[in-house]
């Protein structure tokens, strides 16, 4: 289809009609062969998002659709553009401007996608004639009951997709699919989970959930759905935990839906008691007299340099201005001089922190032992956009180097290949390396149960980042798993872990 690639001089090259000829013939012959037994779709990029260097929707992209008007499945460039994250494309329906012309040149029903989560927007697109059908892939992963809720007028109960592409990462890693909003996704057959229903309680036991981050909120909500009376205690004056922090970073505002959806449902329940600004101690828990305790106490970022690339602390950091990600954002208005963001977690957060600080007009230096910025985000289709965003904003990106040690106001950077040392002057250092679970209260509870009869608990469990630091999706899943597993036979829980669905073709 592209003139820069197709250099034929026969009837299959030259004009756009000739370049489309082979595609049209293949489609027509395929359709003749299969008849009405199945659909034949042609998916191509109506706009490669390369400007004049590629196909554009208002020029040859449209011409191809016009020639094949009754056949095509129009797409916006490759998957990374087709399934953009909310971080880089916050607007719902962002693909509509590229494809709304299709309905005017075909008699076929037209379906469109673009992370459409708002029922009002969906209806408006149909009413104004842009689309006939709404395609909702990621939104229906987040909430499989999306159409039913719209039909029933229960739009306030929709679990809206946050556009994080955790579902896409699962596909790229070839592992069972996961969703930040919907922890039951991928567990329908193996564990029998459903996002709208859950097995009832076994007894009249009460539960205490400590911490209202993603794991704590999910665990509280699901225990209450089962019928248990739940007490939720939060040390802060707001519910949400790490979601509050991360959704406040540049580009991640949609992530707040994770806490907002759960808080809304929790507030509708009459079997949940919520206590904010309540940092519980061992004595407080003993006074409450609740024997089933779920600790969603989160995790804390290390400041000593221990991460993926090194397992021993960096020498010389003790006397320097070293910050955690949370401290860096909180202190941003008062920071000055070069700020180093050191990423040895190699996930998504360090790139967001660097971008946020640069947006605050700081001089930022991004250092990582990896060969690219935020390598894990290749799985969410964001890596190139993240690296581009940092470079465009003026961040000095240094890859393939670790922090060997600190001397005065200098960092000794070590090349991961040659071992060569270089010096870098800085004012503040933000460490994004590794998190340590906050288990102090859990350890006290376990020790008390093992040594005394006072405050004996029938069930003490770490959940979320306090159990194993990970993604928000991981925390939500662990909170859900804890609620589903409560008072259930351990044998059944373990058995489900090893069940594998084996599809067969007939």
Regions found by a protein language model. Name each.
Residues 201-233, 239, 275-289, 296-378, ...:
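Rossmann-like dinucleotide/flavin-binding elements
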Residues 158-163, 245-275, 307-320, 378-405:
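N-terminal glycine-rich dinucleotide-binding loop that anchors FAD/FMN and/or NAD(P) in oxidoreductases
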Residues 104, 224, 267, 358, ...:
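Anion (oxyanion) recognition and catalysis
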Residues 1-210, 214, 219-225, 229-230, ...:
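Flavin-dependent oxidoreductase catalytic cores
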Residues 69-72, 131, 272, 290-291, ...:
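Local beta-strand N-terminus motif with an aromatic residue
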Residues 106, 129-130, 270, 289, ...:
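Short, structured coil segments at secondary-structure junctions
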Residues 3, 43-45, 74-79, 113, ...:
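Generic beta-strand/beta-sheet core signal
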Residues 82-88, 109, 132-133, 244-251, ...:
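Short beta-alpha connecting loops at secondary-structure transitions
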């Amino acid at each position: 289809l592209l003139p820069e690639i197709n250099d034929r001089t026969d009837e299959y090259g030259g004009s756009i009609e000739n370049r489309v000829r082979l595609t049209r013939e293949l489609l027509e012959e395929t359709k003749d062969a299969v008849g009405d037994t199945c659909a034949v779709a042609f998916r191509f990029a109506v706009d490669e998002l390369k400007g004049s260097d590629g196909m554009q929707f208002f020029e040859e992209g449209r011409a191809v659709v016009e020639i094949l008007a009754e056949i095509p499945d129009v797409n916006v460039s490759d998957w990374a553009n087709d399934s953009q994250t909310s971080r880089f494309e916050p607007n719902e329906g962002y693909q509509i401007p590229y494809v709304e012309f299709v309905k005017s040149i075909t008699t076929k029903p037209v379906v469109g996608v673009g992370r459409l989560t708002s029922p009002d927007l969906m209806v408006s697109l149909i009413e104004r004639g842009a689309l006939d059908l709404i395609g909702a892939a990621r939104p229906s992963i987040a909430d499989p009951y999306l159409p039913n809720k719209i039909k029933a007028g229960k739009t306030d109960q929709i679990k809206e997709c946050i556009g994080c592409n955790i579902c896409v990462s699962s596909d790229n890693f070839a592992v069972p699919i996961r969703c930040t909003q919907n922890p039951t996704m991928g567990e329908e057959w193996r564990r029998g989970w459903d996002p709208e229903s859950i097995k009832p309680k076994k007894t009249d036991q009460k539960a205490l959930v400590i911490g209202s981050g993603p794991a704590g909120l999910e665990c509280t909500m699901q225990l209450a759905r089962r019928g248990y009376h739940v007490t939720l205690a939060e040390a802060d004056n707001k519910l949400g935990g790490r979601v509050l922090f991360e959704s406040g970073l540049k580009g991640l505002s949609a992530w707040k839906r994770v806490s907002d959806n759960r808080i809304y449902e929790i507030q509708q329940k009459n079997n949940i008691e919520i206590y904010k600004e309540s940092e519980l101690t061992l004595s407080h828990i003993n006074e409450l007299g609740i024997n089933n305790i779920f600790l969603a106490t989160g995790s804390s970022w290390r400041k000593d340099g221990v991460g993926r690339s090194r397992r021993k602390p960096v020498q010389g950091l003790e006397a320097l201005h070293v910050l955690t990600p949370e401290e860096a954002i909180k202190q941003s208005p008062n920071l000055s001089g070069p700020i180093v963001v050191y990423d040895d977690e190699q996930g998504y957060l360090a790139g967001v922190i660097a971008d946020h600080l640069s947006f605050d007009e700081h001089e930022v230096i991004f250092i990582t032992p990896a060969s690219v910025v935020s390598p894990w985000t290749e799985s969410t289709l964001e890596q190139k956009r993240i690296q581009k965003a940092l470079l465009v904003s003026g961040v000095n990106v240094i890859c393939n180097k670790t922090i060997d040690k600190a001397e005065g106001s200098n960092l000794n950077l070590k090349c991961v290949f040659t071992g060569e040392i270089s010096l870098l002057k800085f004012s503040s250092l933000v460490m994004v390396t590794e998190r340590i679970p906050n288990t102090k209260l859990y350890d006290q509870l376990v020790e008390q149960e093992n040594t005394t009869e006072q405050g004996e608990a029938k069930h003490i469990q770490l959940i979320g980042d306090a159990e194993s630091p990970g993604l928000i999706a991981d925390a939500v899943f662990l909170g859900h798993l804890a609620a589903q597993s409560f008072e259930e036979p351990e044998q059944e829980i373990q058995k489900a872990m090893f069940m594998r669905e084996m599809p067969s073709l007939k």
